[in-house]
């Protein structure tokens, strides 16, 4: 309950009231009489309530009878007027100075905005040092798998260019480095790192405010730089554990892309290539780790044309997610099949089941050895990556399509799941311990975790141990979210795929996107 009190103005010294003045002047006959009357008036001072009401007090101690008869607590006869507190009903306001408050808020917000803007430029150099010393050091081993076009040292020249980009991109990158640092320290078990949290939210607020200002300009709403800004916020949300708000940002980007003509219209753009590549992958992965009831045709329609997707995605299989394009295309088909199963009135069960078995056959026919032969270096790593993703994709195909009754829950498919689970359990430890491949193993690890509901406690223990270590190693909270989801699933007693995920989850480890080619309108 809220309480409000009405307070009087300044305290004032005792002054003779108009009643006292009349009494004094009517009775005064000489200077001596006047003095005597004034002394008597001081001795018989009216209580403060009688003064306020302009009535004659009866001077009773400790409180006058007139106040008592009126049902009022007598405030007494002191030299200083006591504060008068008046009870008001909750929510009731007697007065409000709109102009003063508004002016105060404007001055305050302007001061904060100015101070924040002034604080950004010096922090850019701190971000540069942190990125080169820590984040770049973590990313550099990926070059051993093949030259990564989006991983590079931030030189002084690039730093000067960064100062010229919109404020929301600069602050967004600072947020990424701060978040990386917090996760490396294990912020949840390190209360001493609260200063990093404060800095993070200061720059996060700057990012949101700056992007909102850009978005409010009509001719800039659908620009490349706004898409880059929203994607930066989206990746920040995912890095921070993927609370519910991240999905709104994903939907927002899809709407902007639609306003620009759709993915097919934007795909040829080289400057948008890293952004669209990132967005495609997040969209596909998100549609795997969600209930079928959350699948959205407007999202999946961007990915259902596998030939088109492979054409524009294959160039990034090495530098971005290490997900073999052929398998990713099958994942896209599975997503679309789950959507069809959700509305069975348009499709026959036999037709869906036949498609599902064809997809599973294509997945298991994928050859990691042949895929690795096309790589120029680290062929053993590439074979292991292909093997891990083949088994993870096969598990996704069987478990998710059984959940929507497209595939049967028979012993033959259960045996296949056991085999693929054993393959993951055999190859994931080495993949997670390698600096070259560890950041690409979250989705396969989640798949093993879902399959672990059918297996022994040792598999669950392995998954539960690896996810926090992956979070600290890579500098993102999303593995901790995966740990929470899987442990809740194991404890639920349920076993179907859709029962594991209460909402969409973006189990991807990418924390930033290359915006160096994005043009500012």
Curated annotation (Swiss-Prot):
It comes from Leptosphaeria maculans (strain JN3 / isolate v23.1.3 / race Av1-4-5-6-7-8) (Blackleg fungus). Transcriptional regulator; part of the gene cluster that mediates the biosynthesis of phomenoic acid, a long chain aliphatic carboxylic acid that does not appear to be essential for pathogenicity but may play a role in allowing to outcompete other fungi in the environmental niche via its antifungal properties. Positively regulates the expression of the cluster and subsequent production of phomenoic acid. One of its GO terms (molecular function) is DNA-binding transcription factor activity, RNA polymerase II-specific. Its main location: nucleus. It is found in: Nucleus. GO terms for biological process: positive regulation of transcription by RNA polymerase II. Keywords: DNA-binding, Nucleus, Transcription, Transcription regulation, Zinc. InterPro entries: Fun_TF, Zn2Cys6_DnaBD. Disruption phenotype: Leads to reduced expression of genes for the polyketide synthase PKS2, the cytochrome P450 monooxygenase P450, the alcohol dehydrogenase/quinone reductase YogA, the lipid transport exporter superfamily member RTA1 and the a major facilitator superfamily transporter MFS, as well as a marked reduction in phomenoic acid production. Residues 46-76 bind DNA. This is Phomenoic acid biosynthesis cluster-specific transcriptional regulator. GO terms for cellular component: nucleus.
